[in-house]
């Protein structure tokens, strides 16, 4: 999904939030693997000063990493594009449940809910789903995740650069480093 798709089309945005409403808890339930745990252990013993991740899944945090730069953001926070209000994804989930009573049950009656690799539910019909606006300014709410076509916020780039600049060695795990946001760090 691109940033322009998300901000430019209310129907596309509604479809995204309906899919995400059913699927995001699968990501929330995910647990760190051995690599996440090892990096957190290395940080605790001083072998690495911190972790920079492109992933939005919070697995490094769950593993115990303390100095963590979520370069591409996290699914656990929702931000208003107009006023900048930040709220937890859990808070938005509760609001969406109230606004869409029975939505999950209606979808479940159509069969098993398939979850895509991006942790969103695979849905075709989301026309009856209702999305909330920002409670402060009625603006558009977006997950605090960097989409294609969107820049990584400057403060995250600065944090990542500071972490790299203060290191003698950089260990790369699970990345080809070909994503533009990492090439210059």
Language model: regions and residue ranges:
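Conserved catalytic core of sirtuin-type NAD+-dependent deacylases
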Residues: 1-184
